Every structure is written in structure tokens, then in C-alpha cells.
Amino acid sequence: MTPTRRASARRTAALLLTTSLLAAGTVGAAAAGPGRSGQPDTRGTDDVLHREGFDSLADDLLPRSEDPGIEPGVSGWTHEAPQGWSVENGPGMADGGVEEWRGWSFTTRDFWTDAEDQMRYRFARAQDVIAVADSDEFADGPGTPDAYATTLASTPIKVKGRDAVELTFDSHYRGWAGQTGRVTVAFDGGAETELVRYDSDTVTDDYDGALLNATETVPVDVPHGAKRAVFRWHFTADANSWYWAVDSVSVRTPLAPADGDPTTAWVLSDIQGDPDDLGHALRDLDAVRPDADGLLMVGDIVASGSPDQWQEVDDVMTGATDLLPEQVVAAIGNHESYTGEPWETLRDRFLDFAQRDRVWDEYLLEGSGGEVPVLVLGQEEARPPEVPMSREQVEWLRERLAYWSDRDKQVLVISHFPLGDTVSASWIPWYSDSYQYNDELTELLGAHPNAILFSGHTHYPFELGDWAVQRRTAGGHPDGFWTVNTGAVQVEWDARGESTSGIREIVTRDINRGLTVDVFDDRVVVEARDFGTVDAPASDNDVNEVVRSVTIPNPLAE
């Protein structure tokens, strides 16, 4: 395999970065800000007016009362709302049904799922205590009323002097015919204005992947002179319909329009020996971000790791030399080591492509929006598990995150496998076993709200609610960290099954998808793009469109 000119350039960039960090004394010992020293950053976020995650109720959860699917003595529910919040049930719900689910209840994901799974467990972004309205489980008791109606109301939130606010909340909604979920706002005791509506006209009943394990971000205009706002979550359904769960509610000041030009990256993963689609994806990315400052390749670049496969990819990269950004940053995936040859041989082929001497490293993208740090993680030894990691790599990540947090910079982290309970598919339990240090890495990232983890491997649809997830952790920063599914250049997968214990993953179709990432001083904007498939070298199509986008504010920006 002949290294391309761009490969040589990225090797030089990595060496220059390492040299500059050594000179600054920042490799091996992260710079510590006042009172931080690499410890979890739990500073408040200036633009957040109100935050409610229901976790203050954790010590008040009651033992199982009536639910027939939960073992006696297991604790995990209460009807007592957080201070200032309230629940109002319809008049017909006072008697009958299962006590635990009489209107909006405050519970945990595990307790709720113990009642019955039926996709409840997929609410993986939930942190500790959540709010749940469940007409299905309520109907498992005698004398269940014909209708289910319940409203969760926020405490009055100060909005005086503001023209607009932004409401965000995590949401897990499964619809049914006749069922409705609504979010409204009322100012100073006035009439309610509808902000969000889920019903049979707006939701695919029984299963709508866009609304499971999702988040809602809703702009809200504030009338002149208004002082306080109350938000309400209304849920109505016939008996024995489905459910709605909510967590991590926040009301914040909207971001101002972005200022200046960004530093930009292309992101691709899971090419797996499809050089034609890779070449087409690079051309489509160049069409929409011709001045990109980096290409991030998030693993599974080849199908099994043979020399011929690497040569095919290198041929595509060489043919795209005039298009490629100056920096190409690669992470190792599981498909880089499937030929049956020794791990060291397969690893070294990847490292030859990546033009560095270890699987993990640090890069700086340099563009109009300034310098953007990129941290690369990866498998260091033969599996199992899928991602064995040395303590040196974990501690290096800890130090580098602390270093960039101290400078209030958003940092891009790329690693092929998702962490458990983050993006699409990772709610399936075996994804929590991919990393040797899954829980430690999750807690570590949760202390750094400026960190954004880009992961591939799952091939799941961008259309799902958990394509991009703000994942919070116990004891971490209240904003948690973001993680984004990179899609795939080769085939799409999805999950099938009602319960996690019997879940199946299947291939659904051929795809060609990736991301663009625009980094500004105070935010990162990620666009999930569809390039369409091709079946011959140098062939193109008319598909090059945005499927989803997410704007990730930098909570540490001044």
C-alpha cells in the first residue's frame, strides 16, 4: 500500500501536535483549573433558567404496591412530585386500576421495565428517576376506568424580561389509536398554548422510532410583560393504550445566531469494503463542505483487514486527493481484524493507514472557527472484549478532557463502538460489554459537557429518536455529554422485538450515510446526511440531503 500525500500530511500533523503539547507541558498531566484538577465539572450553566430531572425523589420511592409484574418489596415509585411541580388526574381515575401507575408517576427505568418491557427499556438516556404516564400498566388492575387522563405541571419559571426561551426534555412516547400527548405553556395563569402534540395524525401508532428514547427542543415565544411560565404535559388515552415517559426537563435562553465561520469536519464510518460508495460519499461531502478541515473515519474502514482491502481504500483516497481535507483522522473498528491473522499484524495495517504508531491519539483541526481538538480511542489488544484498553489510554483520556475543559473548548472524541445506553442500539445489554471500561468511560465523559463522542458500528437509522443523545450520569455535569451515531457507508441495521430479552438485529437496506460537523466558538452543529448508494466506480446520483441535524451548545463557553 502506497501512502498518499494526505496520509503523509496527517502523520506530520499528529507529530506536530504531540511535539507542541510536550513543549507546553500538557501531555501526561492535564492543566487544572481552579478547584477542578480533573474532577467532575458540575458548574451551573449560565443560560439555564430551570432544570428538573426528578432525581431529588430517589430517596422517597416506595415499595411495589399492586403491580402484578413486580416482585413484592421492590422499591421504585411515588406519586409525590418534586417541589413546585404537581400532578392532576382526571376525575374518573380515583378508583380501580394499578396504584403505581395512577396518573403521572415518578419511577425508575428498571422498576418500570420490571412491570413489563414492551420497549420501555429502550428509554436508555433516562437518568435515575423519570416521570411516567402508562395507561397500559394501569389497566392491569381490577375496575380500571375506561379513560386515562393525567397532567404533569412544572413549577412557575421566571421569564421576566425575555423575548423567548427554549424548552428541552427527554421523551419516550409509544402511541396508540385515540391516545394523545401534548405539551403546553401558560404565562401568568393565562390560557395554555400548545407546543407539542403527539396523536394518530402526527405519530405512527404502536411503534414510531423517532419518538422512542428521543429529546424534544421547543422554541417558546414569551409575551411582552410576562413574568412566569408553567409548562404542562397532558396525556389522555383509552384504557389499556400505551405510555409516555419524560426526563431531564430544562428551560434555557436560546442561542443567538452563530457568529463567524466554523471549523468543519466530514465524518464517515462502517465502509466495510465498499470503495464505490466511499468515493461517492467523499464527492458528496466535498459538494456541501468543500473547505472542510478534517475527515474523521470512525472505524470499520475495511471488511476484514486484508492487504487487498486496504489497497482498495487507499486507491479511493488517492483518487480523491484533490477533494480530501488536509487532516484525515482514523479510528480502529472490529472489521479491521477479521482475517484470522495475528492481532499485531492486523493492527499494524490499520496503523499504516492511520499514519501513527498507536491506536489512540490526539489531533487538532485548524480552520476558520479556530482549533478543534479530536481525541481518538480504540482497541489495543485482541478481543474479547471488543475494546480492550490499557490504563494508560484511559488516564490519557481523563487528562486530555480535563485539559480542554479547563480551556472551555468543545472536544470531539471518536471511537468505533458506542458506549452502553447512549445512541441507537446501545440500549441492548450486550453493547454495555463492548468496552473493557464501559462504566468508567461513561462517568468520565459525563463530567465534561464539552465532550461529544462520535461512534459507529451499529449502522442504525438516522431517523431514530436516539441518533444523537445527551447522556447524563450520576455525579457528573448536569448537562452530561453528547454522543452521536455516525451512520454507515455500507448497509443499515435495526432492532426488532417487543422485549429486550428477545431482541433481534436485522439488515434492513443498503445505504450510504455520514455527517458534517461545524464547530463554532459556542456550539457544534452536526448534520446527518444521506448520499444515496452507487454500484460502479466514479458513479453518482442525485441524492445528497440532510436527514437530521442537532445543535450542541458549549455549556462552558463564556
Model-derived regions: residue spans:
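Secretory targeting and sorting signals
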Residues: 1-34
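Beta-sandwich/jellyroll recognition modules and their flexible linkers
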Residues: 38-256
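N-terminal active-site segment of His-dependent metallophosphoesterases
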Residues: 253-310
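A short C-terminal boundary segment appended to hydrolase-like catalytic domains
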Residues: 258-259, 503-558
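Active-site-proximal beta-strand elements of phosphoester/diester hydrolases
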Residues: 262-272, 371-381, 412-416, 481-488, ...
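Active-site neighborhood of phospho(di)ester-bond hydrolases with catalytic His/Asp-centered motifs
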Residues: 267-269, 295-300, 328-334, 413-415, ...
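Extended active-site neighborhood of metal-dependent phosphoesterases/phosphodiesterases
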Residues: 307-407, 436-441, 446-447, 460-520, ...
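Short acidic, glycine-rich surface-loop motifs adjacent to enzyme active sites
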Residues: 404-424
